[in-house]
């Protein structure tokens, strides 16, 4: 009995040791991701030529799948690659649409210019009756509607632009003929002059002549109405933060959803104000870069105030083509003191919006704002520097507008001062009012030479187009800097940082890469289950449904890996079809543009990612498996997942530092498994078994044996010859201790009685050599006998020990069998007794039920009798 208990204990301990071990298991289809900077592609509902050749058609799918997770978000390009992509891509759009194509280098010559007088071309715009004789625009809020403005009064208040009529000479069509003289009208801001000959004539050059390459746009093109969406390639996704208190930076956004594409975003490039953007909330928001940076601040207006700006160019401008030489035509314009001037009117409750902005600024936390808390000491001012920075700059119908914002800023601040914040009287500058006035409209200037801040270069475009120009834009925000050198005053300075536009549009999104391969320890060493039939699940949410389980526990998510992996593959295939259709359309029109190449790159990236995942699974022996058990032991006992409460995302972040080690062990285990499988197949191969009956194989074996025997004999002969040579050279053989030595008399030489020979030494040497060889053979025979005896005893002892072990094992199995039989007998007895008791109880209940009428009858009879 004691041995039985010991045996059972050993077996239980062994089973416990085996079950306590955990093995690495590979899961495919888990909802896990990591931040990515892969190139996104675009969708657009616009049907223009540029849109159809650069973006795929919009599918109008705005499905959002909520995730029960927390995720960090950042709205600026240095930490959000999607914002950096937008800045680069919109610049490419800008370059492609407004691409200069005619070199202006022939005009980098000396020109004789004469300043034009102040005779002004009258505007042809019909006038309206002003509602007030004091201001051009009147209304409840000093001109909230453009219809309340007198266009004639506004145009008369516009300052004259100094211009010059310049003449220059060139060879013309035939180079050996006399030079032709041409006359061109230039704005004084686009030329620089020297060596004035008199008060009116001067020598001038174009302002861009110091630059290396300057080109002029052939055609006027623009994209005022173009809106697009950024979409993640297959195998990637976009996460969106929906928290109401999101301000461009949040470490733990709790209301997170996954989307395939962003919302429609605006592509209007501006400085200072955000035009035609998207409204997020019905309230004013202040976003600061990295939460505490006051040099990059984004203010999003409340849509309740209905802010907008309407720009128009008065008059009918005529562009004159000047043929310089064959194949080179330059565009000039008529003499006019308002060559490039326009005006814009700001509509809506701007003062109410500005009051709410100031209130939001003083409500900022102390770690984000340390300026004054008095809203009366917060002022809005413009920037200094390049024209694009000091003015409100944007593109309207292909023309570049530069707005001097002093009048409008005075209106918002309700102050009367100049650009240097010096109080002054509203004196007129000629027919135009001075800088110290309050207006809801400002003067715009159209420029042809602009500064490209993205490439740090200059670009020259054609003069303004003919006809009437007008465009209306909604104002959704502004980019500013918060400057407070003292606590008595805070300056809100308009900023030319274009990147903030895309931060406002895409700041709630982040691009992530789906990593569907995960590792976790399980008690199963290898996959032993049979084939299970799996239900086909319809793709209700497609690719987004794959990430819907991101917030669920690991155990629940692992149970639906098959469906999730199908969602992943279905989303990849659908996106590939859409991208391929767009690329084919671009190929047919021979317009594979820069963005078309990006779309093609997104398609290739998705295929590469999917093939890379499958290649990794195949290298571990887990190809096309959702759950793959391996033979690699999990060595990190202090890291185990909580299958009921932990998500896959949390678990993968815990073991991120172990991934390279895990993958290396899986690859080594797979290689060893393949080697073992190859060796096993060779052992179990029937071709190898029947090869033993091949006569040629036996001949080879005999040949090898014969060669071995010949080699041994040859070595023995060489050894014998070598020994003989050594003995001959020595001249004697040492006497063996076994040879008897005859005793001779003292002083008597050997064989002294026999005359003649000098003794019998040769015969004695030969006999001793033969006896020595015989003794060596006897020693070898004795050694072999002892070796044989030792081998026999060892084998006998081993067999005895094995027999004893087998007897112990047989005895233990017999005891286990006896114990199992006793347990079964006991269980059978208990079951029999239980069944018998149940039978008795049922029979008693049945009898009681059956006998109830009889007993009732008997009771009634007794009562009645």
UniProtKB/Swiss-Prot annotation:
A Pfam family the protein falls into: GP120
Annotated stretches, region: V3: 311-343
Signal sequence, start to end:
1-20
**Residue numbers spanned by region V2:** 166-209
Query: Native species of this protein?
Result: Simian immunodeficiency virus agm.vervet (isolate AGM TYO-1) (SIV-agm.ver)
UniProt site (Cleavage): 536-537
Q: Which residues cross the membrane?
A: 706-726
Name of protein: Envelope glycoprotein gp160
- List the stretches on the Extracellular face of the membrane: 21-705
Locus of motif YXXL motif? 732-735
Miscellaneous note, as given in the UniProt record, is:
This is an African green monkey isolate.
**BP terms from Gene Ontology:** membrane fusion involved in viral entry into host cell; symbiont entry into host cell; virion attachment to host cell
